[in-house]
Structure formats: C-alpha cells, structure tokens
Amino acid sequence: MQINKQLTAILLWVRIMIHLEHISKTYTRKKEIIKAVDDVSIDIKEGEIFGIIGFSGAGKSTLVRCINLLEYPDAGGKVTVDGVKLTSLNSKELRRQRSNIGMIFQHFNLMPSRTVIENVLYPLAYKGIKKGDQIKKATELLKLVDLSDRIDNYPSQLSGGQKQRVAIARALALDPKVLLCDEATSALDPQTTYEIIELLKKLNEKLKLTIVVITHEMDVVKDLCSRVAVMEKGKVVEQGEIFNVFSNPKSDVTTRFMKATSNLSKAEILIKRYKDFLNLHNGDVLARLSYIGKGVSEPIISSLTEKFHVAINIILADVALLHGNPIGGTVCIFSGDKEAIENALASLDKDNVKVEVLSHE
C-alpha cells in the first residue's frame, strides 16, 4: 500500500519547465492588425520533447520566440521558464536567464569566417571563463554532436547536417536547460533529418534537456515528440499525448495535417486524376479504413472476405509507430453484393475501425 502511495505521488509530481499563460502577439502592418498568436496557454514538462505543429502561417514560430522573449507577448501574457517569470525581468536579468535557453534555426546562422570550433566558442567569449576551459568545453560539445574531426573546418566545407550539428553544439555552450528548435530539419534531406532527430533524442536523454520542436513535418513529430500542440490561425486547437492526438483527432486541422502527410491522402488524387486506374465497376465501393493499436496487426481484410464473401482490393496502405503504438489505415475497393458490402463496412465500425466512403459506383 505504501509503495502504491509513493508511486502515485511521483506520478502526480511533474515539474513544469515552461509555463505559457495567455500568450498573444499582435502586429500592425499597413494599418492591418494581425493576430499571430491568440491567447495560447501551454505547460511543457521538464525533460520532455514537446512538439508544436501546424501549417505555414499558423503562428508556431512566433510562439516559440515568445518563450525566450525574442518576441515579447502582448500585455497580460506570462512566460515562466525554470520557475522564473521572464516577462517580469529587466533587460539585464533577462540576458542572464536567456543563457538557460538555447535555440537552433532552419538556416543554421553560422559565422562563415570562423572555424567550427570558433563558432562554438563564440557564446563563451565574454563569460569570464578561462580560454583553456572554453576550448575544452567546445571540444567536448563537438564530440557530443559527432564532429570531432571537423573542428578546424569552415562552414562552407560542411554539409547541411554538419552545419546544424555545429549550431546545436553552439546552442549548448552555456549548458541550457531548454533547447528551442525552430524548423531545425526543414532544410535537410530525409536521411539527414533522421540523423538530427536521433541526435536530439540522445541529447534529451544524456543532458536531461527539455526540447521544444517547431515543425510542419509529421515524421519529425512522430519520431521525436512525446506530446504535441496543434496550431491554426494563432490558436492551439488541440494538445496532448501524441498518440491520443493523432489516433483520434478532435480538430479539422489535425485531420488535414495527418491526411496531407499520409500515403492515404493519395486516394483523393486517384479519384480526381486517375479514376480509370481504380477501375471501379458497378456496385464497387472505395473506402478508407483507419485503425489504431492492435487492430493494425489483425487480419481485418481477410476476415471480412471470409465472413461476408466480398472481394477487397487494397489500393493504398500506411502504418506509423507513435511511441511504440501502431496507427494506420488502408484504402480499399469493396466488390460484391451490395448488402454484403454494407454489412462488411458496418462490422468495421463496430470494431472501432473508422470507415470513410470515398466513392461508389
């Protein structure tokens, strides 16, 4: 009994590293008022990797810049990082607290006339640290990001992925507790993106970093984040555990985001442009099936064929893993007796498989 109480206490006590309360950001451009961020409140736990996603113009980059006050929120908005209310600090105190927050960007922002190690040394230059200790620190960081062999190279001699590794090492120079990543993989190819994701995972685990990831790339969110907030038109329309958000989206933008990044979204393209390829006959039904958890691995299609005597042709399929939980779907053509097809689709609905009829002949 005592053990259960202790476990409950541990689970309930989760330290909040970043607390955003009623954050708004308004711009005036050519007499037009633009609400880039609209009354957003988010809590990000210590040591977690939190994603903020949305389509272009959703306000996610503006929001993340409010965390370290590169953008000041409108009056009434409060930003607290590691227990310190940044929005209440004077400029000197804010500069000191910003050393707890590292940041990387899409375009690296390296100094081209300085070597790799000189770029990493730059944040340490005016911190009263002995030169020898600075070099030791920078060398250790470059080893951590797997760039020990590139210390004396210039940025022009590096690939995009290597440049981002230098930027990460530089962002970690002052031992921050938080790392903000603003579209950090958007300029990289898929393989390099994967490598940067794996590096961020390693840093999160090794350094106990709290990482905030701003992205429009679904694969980055799926592979990296434990929780996510979805933004549209400056608002957070949905947030929670990544599996819960994407397996059962509550907002239209989350559904559109998933469709835009899923292989199953090609079904609409097939219908509009290549209907002859589908070769739908009289009575056929084209349907999209979405399922989660154990349903992904169950023989759903073969069971339907056997039970209802309908022919099912799989046109598209997609399966993803969200923190070890499978989520997926298929686009299929159902052929056979009309009543049998209706019964087959109805049985799927009873088994918690979402059915969306896309076309029927």
Predicted regions and their residues:
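A short, surface-exposed alpha-helical micro-motif characterized by mixed small hydrophobic
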Residues: 221-223
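Conserved signature/switch motifs of ABC ATPase nucleotide-binding domains
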Residues: 153-156, 174, 181
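Conserved ABC transporter NBD signature motif
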Residues: 76-85
